[in-house]
Regions:
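Extended hydrophobic secondary-structure segments that form protein cores and membrane-embedded regions
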Residues: 14-15, 92-96, 141-142
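Predominantly the C-terminal beta-signal and adjacent terminal strand-loop region
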Residues: 130-179
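Outer-membrane beta-barrel domain signature
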Residues: 4, 20-27, 62-68, 109-117, ...
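Membrane-embedded beta-strands of outer-membrane beta-barrel proteins
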Residues: 34, 77-79, 124-126, 142, ...
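Transmembrane beta-barrel architecture of outer-membrane proteins
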Residues: 17, 27-31, 72-76, 119-124, ...
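Gram-negative (and chloroplast) outer-membrane scaffold detector with strong preference
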Residues: 41-136
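Short glycine/proline- and aromatic-enriched beta-strand/turn motifs that initiate or cap beta-hairpins
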Residues: 2-44, 48-56, 149, 170-179
C-alpha cells in the first residue's frame, strides 16, 4: 500500500483494537488498545498499548479465604512483512512486549497493599487485513508470547495466590486507518 503522495511510506493508526488473551491470567483477559506505526512497501512496524479488564483470583491454597485483584497493561512492538492479494493481506510478524501487572490482596487478615511487576515477553503471530477502502482496513491477528519472567502473586504470611503463566495466546481485532 502506498500513501496518496506516491511514496512507498505511509503512517497507520490502529483504533480501536479489541484483545482477548488466554493463559497469563486464570481466565481470558479482555482488553482494548490503541496503536500507531509505519508501513514501507510490504513491511510494517507498529506499537500498540492495551489495558485489560481486572480479574479477582482466589488463592490456590486449600481452605484459604484470600486472593488478589489483578490489573494488567501491555505495550507491544510488532514487525510484519505482508503479502497482498486484491483487498486482502496476510503478514507473519515478530513481536516484543512489555507486561505490567498490579496486584492488591483481599480477604480475612490481608492488608490490601498494592504491588506491581514489569517484565518482557517475545512472540510471533499472523495478522490479516481486509481493505474495505484504500484508507481503512479491518484486521485480525493471532499471536503467541513467551513470558520472560513468571511473577508470583503471594500474600505475605499467608501463602501463594497464583503464579502467572509462562506463555500467552492473544487474538485481536481492530481497524487500521491510513491517512
Amino acid at each position: 500500500m502506498q500513501s496518496t503522495a506516491g511514496t512507498p511510506w505511509s503512517f497507520v493508526l490502529h483504533a480501536p483494537v479489541l484483545a482477548a488473551d488466554l493463559e497469563l491470567f486464570p481466565r481470558p483477559a479482555l482488553g482494548i488498545g490503541l496503536g500507531a506505526g509505519i508501513r514501507y512497501r510490504a513491511w510494517q512496524i507498529f506499537a500498540t498499548g492495551y489495558v485489560y479488564r481486572a480479574q479477582s483470583v482466589a488463592s490456590l491454597e486449600p481452605g484459604s479465604a484470600f486472593g488478589a485483584r489483578l490489573r494488567r497493561a501491555s505495550g507491544q512492538l510488532f514487525t510484519c512483512h505482508g503479502r497482498r492479494w486484491s483487498q486482502f493481506e496476510a503478514a507473519p510478524c515478530i513481536a516484543l512486549a512489555l507486561e505490567y501487572v498490579t496486584a492488591r490482596g483481599f480477604g480475612e487478615g490481608v492488608a490490601p497493599r498494592l504491588r506491581h511487576a514489569v517484565w518482557p515477553a517475545v512472540g510471533a503471530g499472523l495478522v490479516t487485513h481486509w481493505y474495505a477502502l484504500e484508507s481503512l482496513a479491518l484486521f485480525a491477528a493471532l499471536s503467541g508470547y513467551v513470558e520472560l519472567a513468571r511473577p508470583r502473586v503471594a500474600i505475605q504470611d499467608l501463602g501463594l495466590v497464583r503464579r502467572l503463566a509462562p506463555a500467552t495466546v492473544s487474538a485481536t481485532l481492530g481497524l487500521e486507518w491510513i491517512p
